[in-house]
Curated annotation (Swiss-Prot):
GO cellular component labels: cytosolic large ribosomal subunit
Organism: Exiguobacterium sibiricum (strain DSM 17290 / CCUG 55495 / CIP 109462 / JCM 13490 / 255-15)
Superkingdom field: Bacteria
Gene giving rise to this polypeptide: rpmC
Molecular functions (GO terms): structural constituent of ribosome
Keyword Chaperone: no
Family: Belongs to the universal ribosomal protein uL29 family.
Signal sequence segment: none
Keyword annotations of the record: Ribonucleoprotein, Ribosomal protein
UniProt entry tagged with the keyword Ribonucleoprotein: yes
Protein name stated in the entry: Large ribosomal subunit protein uL29
Lineage, top ranks: Bacteria, Bacillati, Bacillota, Bacilli, Bacillales
PROSITE patterns linked: RIBOSOMAL_L29
GO biological process: translation
Length: 67
């Protein structure tokens, strides 16, 4: 998900998405360890999505306005 899309969501929605992405990341890592992971690139995508969402949340916390 792009940062511009994330900036349009509320803080509660972002926190919910981060939680669900963390859960998905846990499951992906578990699948990787057991050899059942079909798409290893998904781990990277989820990690980056978490980072983007946390960045947007931190920007709001600091009052930074990035369009």
């Amino acid at each position: 998900m792009k940062a511009t899309d994330l900036r349009q969501q509320t803080t509660e929605e972002l926190n919910g998405k981060v939680g669900s992405w963390k859960e998905e990341l846990f499951n992906l890592r578990f699948q990787l360890a057991t050899g059942q992971l079909e798409n290893p690139a998904r781990i990277r995508e989820v990690r980056k999505s978490i980072a983007r969402a946390k960045t947007v949340l931190r920007e709001r916390e600091l009052g930074i306005n990035n369009a």
